[in-house]
C-alpha cells in the first residue's frame, strides 16, 4: 500500500482564537472546541446551543413537505379499509431500516402489510421486473416505496394500469421529473419543494410520513432506526438529522430502544460496543455495515427487515449472528479488491477524478472500495466493474453530483448503448452528495474522462488538508477531548475536528504488527510529550522529518490522550 504523502498542503485554520472566544464564554467550551463550533458556521451563542443541544424544534412539520397531505390521506384510507399494502424498500442500510420502521408503525395501526426488499443483483429501484414480481406475489392495492421510486416512471405507470396505486417516499436527486403518481414525497424533488431541510435519508422521509399519520408526531421510540439510516447512508449530520441522531443515542444509552433486532446486532458486535456507550462512530463502522453486508454478499436482504421487525430475541440473535458472518466475509473481499485497486491506480494518481477499474468487483462492494480509496487519496473516486456498473464516493465537502453531471455532459451518461449481446441499454447514475451508483457506462470512456473533470484537486494533485484551528500541544488534555465529544456526533457535513499543531519533534516511531499503523511519540519545544497514531502509514516509518507540523484529531485511548494523525509535513517555522 502506498505511504501517505509528506508534501501535502494544509488549508488555513478556519477560525482564530479571537473569533472563537465569544462562543467559548457563552458555552463553557475550551477555546479549540469553540473554534470548531464557529468553523462549522454556528457563530452565535444561539446557533452554538442548537449544535450542542438540538431539540425537536428541528423536526419540522411533516405537512410542510410537498405532497404529504395526499400521501398521508391515501395511506389512512388503505389502513381503514384493510387494503393490502406492500412496502418496497431499497436493499441498503437506509431502505431496509426505513421499510422496517414503516412496517412496525403500520402494523401497530392494524394495517394489512407486507414488505419486500429486492436482491441487490436486480439493480436499484422499482424496475419493471420487480413491479411484475410485486403484482404476482403480493397483489397489493397500494405500494409504498422507501428510499427509491423517484425515477421509476415506467414501473409506476404499469402498476397503475393494473389498478395498483404507488406512493413514493424517497430522497434521491433525479433529473427525470416528478413520477407519475399523486402520492410522492421527496425533500429533493425538483418542482418547487419548500421543506426546510432537504438532507433527510430515505428512512427519514419514511419517518416524516409516520409523523403525518401519527397522533404523537414526535415519537422518540422510532428515532433509533432513523439514526441508523442517517449515519449509514452518509447524509448530512446537521439540522434535523442531527436531532434524530443525538436523540436516538440518548435513547439507546438509557436502554429505552424497543427494537429487539437493533439490540441483537449490538450484542453480536461485542468488544467495546454496548448499548450504554454506543456512538455515531460505532453505528457507522460496526452496525450499518452488518445491515449492508447481507445484500452485498448476495444473501436475502429481507432477513434484515425481519431482524428489525421481530419481537423474538432468539430469532433476532440468530439473524444478527448471520449478519456478523456475512460482514466478516465482506471485509475480507473488500480488502482484497482494495489492494487490487491500488495496484491498478498506482501510488500517485494525478487525475482530478480517481477511476478504479476492477473487472470482477460486485456492485455490493464497489462503494466500500471507493470509500477506502477516498480515505487514502482524499479525492472523489469511482469504482467500475467489467459490466460498466459501479459506485462512487467523495471526500466530505466535495459534492459528487456535479462531477457526475460533468460526465453526463461528456456523453457518458444519459445515452443509449448497445451491448455485445445486442441488447440496448441506457447508461445512468443516481445518488446524493457523497455517494452514487451507476450502470452501463462505457469503461474505456470513463477511464479517459477522469483527466477532464473540472473542480478537482489543487496544485500538487491533492485537495488541501482541512484545518479547523491551530493549537499548541499543551492545550490537548482530557478537557479538550470531552469538549470535542460534546460538539459531536460527527459525520457527513460535520466532520471530526482537525487541528494543526506545529513544530513537533518525533521521538519514537513503531510500526504495528500488521505493518499498517504507525505509533509515535511526539514532543513540543517545551518537552511535553504525547502519543500519536497514524493509520495506514506504516510504510512512512523512518521517513518522517525530525520536526513536523501535523494535522490531527484528538482522542482518548487506553487511559491516555493521544493524537490521531491525518497528515504531516516538514515543520515550517
Residue ranges of model-derived segments:
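Cofactor-/ligand-binding subdomain signature composed of acidic, glycine-rich
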Residues: 1-81, 286-325
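A structured phosphate/pyrophosphate-recognition subdomain
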Residues: 33, 80-83, 91, 178-349, ...
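Divalent metal-coordination and catalytic microenvironments
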Residues: 37, 90-92, 144, 170, ...
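N-terminal small/polar loop signature for handling phosphorylated ligands or for N-terminal nucleophile
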Residues: 66-179, 184-185, 190, 332, ...
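Glycine-rich, acidic loop segments that terminate in or are immediately followed by a histidine
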Residues: 349-350, 355-470
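OB-fold single-stranded nucleic acid-binding module
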Residues: 444-449, 514, 539, 544-573
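Accessory interdomain/linker segments of ATP-dependent helicases and helicase-like nucleic-acid enzymes
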Residues: 469-531
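Beta-strand/loop nucleic-acid-binding surfaces
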Residues: 527-542
Amino acid at each position: 500500500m502506498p505511504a501517505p504523502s509528506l508534501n501535502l498542503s494544509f488549508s488555513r485554520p478556519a477560525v482564530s482564537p479571537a473569533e472563537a472566544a465569544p462562543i467559548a464564554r457563552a458555552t463553557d467550551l475550551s477555546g479549540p472546541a469553540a473554534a470548531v463550533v464557529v468553523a462549522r458556521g454556528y457563530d452565535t451563542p444561539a446557533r452554538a446551543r442548537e449544535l450542542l443541544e438540538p431539540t425537536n424544534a428541528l423536526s419540522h412539520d411533516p405537512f410542510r413537505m410537498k405532497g404529504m397531505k395526499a400521501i398521508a390521506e391515501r395511506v389512512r384510507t388503505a389502513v381503514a379499509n384493510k387494503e393490502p399494502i406492500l412496502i418496497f424498500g431499497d436493499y441498503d442500510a437506509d431502505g431496509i431500516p426505513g421499510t422496517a420502521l414503516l412496517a412496525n408503525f403500520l402494523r401497530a395501526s392494524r394495517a394489512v402489510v407486507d414488505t419486500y426488499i429486492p436482491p441487490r443483483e436486480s439493480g436499484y429501484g422499482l424496475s419493471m421486473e420487480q413491479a411484475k414480481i410485486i403484482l404476482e406475489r403480493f397483489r397489493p392495492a397500494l405500494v409504498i416505496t422507501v428510499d427509491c421510486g423517484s425515477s421509476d416512471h415506467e414501473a409506476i405507470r404499469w402498476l397503475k394500469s393494473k389498478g395498483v396505486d404507488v406512493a413514493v417516499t424517497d430522497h434521491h436527486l433525479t433529473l427525470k421529473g416528478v413520477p407519475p403518481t399523486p402520492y410522492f414525497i421527496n425533500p429533493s424533488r425538483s418542482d418547487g419543494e419548500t421543506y426546510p431541510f432537504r438532507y433527510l435519508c430515505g428512512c427519514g422521509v419514511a419517518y416524516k410520513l409516520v409523523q403525518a399519520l401519527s397522533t404523537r408526531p414526535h415519537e422518540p421510540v422510532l428515532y433509533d432506526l432513523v439514526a441508523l439510516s442517517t449515519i449509514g447512508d452518509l447524509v448530512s449530520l446537521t439540522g434535523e438529522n442531527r436531532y434524530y441522531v443525538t436523540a436516538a443515542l440518548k435513547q439507546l444509552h438509557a436502554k429505552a430502544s424497543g427494537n429487539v433486532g437493533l439490540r441483537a446486532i449490538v450484542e453480536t458486535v461485542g468488544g467495546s460496543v454496548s448499548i450504554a456507550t454506543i456512538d455515531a462512530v460505532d453505528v457507522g463502522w460496526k452496525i450499518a455495515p452488518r445491515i449492508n453486508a447481507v445484500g452485498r454478499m448476495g444473501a436475502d436482504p429481507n432477513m434484515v427487515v425481519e431482524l428489525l421487525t421481530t419481537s423474538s430475541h432468539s430469532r433476532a440473535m440468530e439473524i444478527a449472528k448471520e449478519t456478523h458472518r456475512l460482514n466478516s466475509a465482506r471485509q475480507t473481499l473488500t480488502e482484497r479488491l482494495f489492494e487490487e485497486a491500488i495496484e491498478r491506480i498506482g501510488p500517485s494518481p494525478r487525475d482530478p477524478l480517481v477511476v478504479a477499474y476492477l473487472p470482477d468487483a460486485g456492485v455490493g462492494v464497489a462503494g466500500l472500495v471507493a470509500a477506502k480509496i477516498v480515505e487514502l487519496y482524499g479525492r472523489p473516486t469511482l469504482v467500475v466493474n467489467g459490466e460498466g456498473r459501479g459506485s462512487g464516493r467523495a471526500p466530505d465537502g466535495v459534492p459528487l453530483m456535479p462531477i457526475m453531471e460533468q460526465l453526463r455532459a461528456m456523453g457518458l451518461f444519459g445515452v443509449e448503448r448497445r451491448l455485445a449481446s445486442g441488447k440496448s441499454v441506457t447508461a445512468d447514475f443516481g445518488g446524493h452528495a457523497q455517494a452514487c451508483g451507476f450502470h452501463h457506462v462505457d469503461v474505456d470512456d470513463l477511464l479517459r474522462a477522469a483527466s477532464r473533470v473540472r473542480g478537482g484537486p489543487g496544485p500538487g494533485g491533492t485537495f488541501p488538508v482541512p484545518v479547523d484551528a491551530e493549537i499548541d500541544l499543551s492545550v490537548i488534555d482530557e478537557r479538550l477531548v470531552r469538549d470535542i465529544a460534546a460538539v459531536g456526533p460527527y459525520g457527513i457535513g460535520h466532520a471530526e475536528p482537525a487541528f494543526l499543531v506545529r513544530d513537533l519533534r518525533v521521538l519514537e516511531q513503531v510500526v504495528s504488527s500488521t505493518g499498517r499503523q504507525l505509533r509515535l511519540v511526539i514532543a513540543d519545544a517545551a518537552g511535553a510529550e504525547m502519543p500519536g497514531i497514524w493509520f495506514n502509514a506504516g510504510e512512512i516509518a523512518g521517513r518522517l522529518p525530525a520536526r513536523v507540523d501535523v494535522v490531527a484529531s484528538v482522542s482518548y485511548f487506553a487511559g491516555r490522550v493521544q493524537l490521531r494523525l491525518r497528515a504531516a509535513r516538514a515543520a515550517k517555522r
